[in-house]
Amino acid sequence: MFRLKRVWLIHIVALTISNLAFGQLSEVATDSGTYRGHISPIDERVTVFQGIGYAAPPVGDLRWKPPSPAIPFAGVREADRVSAACWQARNSDASVYARGNLNRSEDCLYLNVFTGAEGSAADLPVMVWFHGGGNTAGHGGPLIFDGSNLAKRGAVVITANYRLGAFGFLAHPALTS
């Protein structure tokens, strides 16, 4: 599972950087389709791509299986909305993950990319942030971590959702057969 995530993350970053080098700031082509980013509300020098699918929705027959490749699509998708957080128990009001109205779904394997709005042919540092939460809570959306401040300083920042609790970490021989 980690290897597939790593391959997709590297692919997204490489495409983002290559598109920035050629001045195409608002659209990124991936193996699954083309996404159109938007300007960060925190800093107009940053372009944000939210809700980029890195795997097929892990529902139905895919629920207890390793991630499958993202489902290809035609046209251009607006990458301007935070995806749902992966399914998790409701947290107490004291939890950092309880802020706001957290939408939860099993269809949650998405990532977000924050990058400088001005193109650069230089190699850029990349930071991939996986939220905490003890493998039971959290999400990669900007409610918890917004990569705009690092992106405006020249880094490419990627945040990601991953399956939580039993949906992501349940181990049983019947599930692998």
Identify the residue ranges that each predicted region occupies.
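Bacterial N-terminal signal peptides
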Residues: 8-19
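N-terminal secretory signal peptides that target proteins for export/translocation
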Residues: 1-6
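Non-catalytic accessory segments of hydrolases
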Residues: 23-177
